[in-house]
Amino acid sequence: AVAIDEVKRFIAQQDLNAETRFVPEKVIPKVDGEFEEKIAIIGGGPAGLSCAYYLAEKGYRPTVFEKEKQPGGMLMHGIPEFRLEKDVIEAEIDVLRALGVEFRCGVEVGRDVTIPELREQGYKGFYVAIGLQSGGRLGVPGEDAEGVKAGIELMREVNLEEKKSLSGRVVVIGGGNIGADVARTALRCGAEKVSLYCLEDYDSMPMGVEDRTECEEDGIEIHAGWGQTEILAENGRCSGIRFRKCLSVRNAEGRFAPTFDDNTTEEVPCDMVLYCIGQKVDWKGLLTGTAVELNPNGTAKADPVTYQTAEPDIFVGGDVYTGQKFAIDAIAAGKQGAVSLHRWVQDATLTIGRDKREFIELDKNNLLLEEASYDNTPRQRIGYNETLRKTFKDGRVAFTEEQVKAETARCLGCGASVVDPNKCIGCGICTTRCAFDAIHLHRDLPECSTMRSAEDKMKGILPYMIKRKIRIRRAKKAEKRNG
């Protein structure tokens, strides 16, 4: 596959240059100027910033309420700087300011001001995107010992420069991308030794291959296939952790149901345990005075297309609705949230003409593609500045322009088919034009339609077609005789 992340990084770096900085023009569909309706965005993370961007581009001046000292959410406070440099985020936020977005930082909705009070101030719509700010619980004895904390708390402390010093031996629990970030951050904060434990086996770890490789290159020990059973403590402080071997993580139905071998255990001495096994929403008093309903896991209930909650003027997006996902998912949700808010405050329909966002992943294991049929050029590799290893600076060396050209030339052009169901009239041309016979038409609700398939129609039409053909031929012969 093409190294799309590195190609995008190169393009983004060009966009950071002052002379090529892109600030979109506002598209204002009104003769008398911008929209005057006030919209409040609660949470300055990726979903909230995305929503603010698209609303501002459309002609609004939304207000973003952020409880921290600076906007950015998990992009700013949950991702280490050696992965995502803060000046990049700040540059993107500057674009929003240039578009007229107002930021009210240090204001926590639900504590400093409530949603009913904001309504009294004239706000007509609300977008709640506060993300998952709190770490879960380990659920084992001893987890209240000093030195045991959620990894996301460490990330927040380090990014806010409240803490950048650790010592001793650190155990990180969790094999996802956050676990990798926390482990590498702990090492950079001065930990003598960092070990990462997870339930999954080595090849099934949720973190990407690149994250795993970077952890190992930093000297982090990865122990796959282990589940914690107890935190060991001395005088109230963490002194170690006990694990047992994990045999399987999911059952036959694919549900999370780990099984263990109680006879195979391991006791690991350590001074700190950082767990990265999921996060949850901390609503506090945000929803006080509203009718917003919650799911059993604490996320908000909302329409899957419009993101509208049981409180009509409140919309949600990002992890607060979907649960833990990637930043790009939150950014996409923010765009759809902006569409819904625009329609809501303009008293328009929320549903007609919406992007249903159905994504069907390419089955890479079912490709009729012979390796000898294309130029199998090796993938471009990024360099690494070894002098920056184990520092908070990003040591990855971005692609040069020549590398970008070489990498994009590797694309096989499989393409992406975008289908808008709102515009499909069922003509069937796409099914006949597809060279790979990959498109087929199906009626979702046949009981609601009087349409008949072409095969069924031909059974009734064919006899009349033949009779008509015969009559036409006879008529032509009669004309010749009479002529």
Where on the chain are the PLM-derived regions?
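Iron-sulfur cluster-binding cysteine motifs and their immediate structural context
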Residues: 1-12, 70, 100-103, 406-446
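Glycine-rich dinucleotide-binding loop and its adjacent helix/turn
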Residues: 11-33, 91-111, 135-189, 294-310
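Feature captures the FAD/FMN-dependent oxidoreductase FAD-binding
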Residues: 33-40, 90-140, 230-242, 247-250, ...
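N-terminal Rossmann-like FAD-binding beta1-loop-alpha1 element of flavoenzymes
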Residues: 37-63, 179-187
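Rossmann-like dinucleotide-binding cores of NAD(P)H-dependent redox enzymes
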Residues: 64, 68-99, 103, 158, ...
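FAD-site-proximal beta/loop scaffold in flavoenzymes
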Residues: 146-167, 231, 251-324
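Mid-to-C-terminal Rossmann-like scaffold of FAD/NAD(P)H-dependent oxidoreductases
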Residues: 213, 219, 227-237, 249, ...
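A conserved FAD-binding loop/helix module that cradles the flavin
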Residues: 317-345
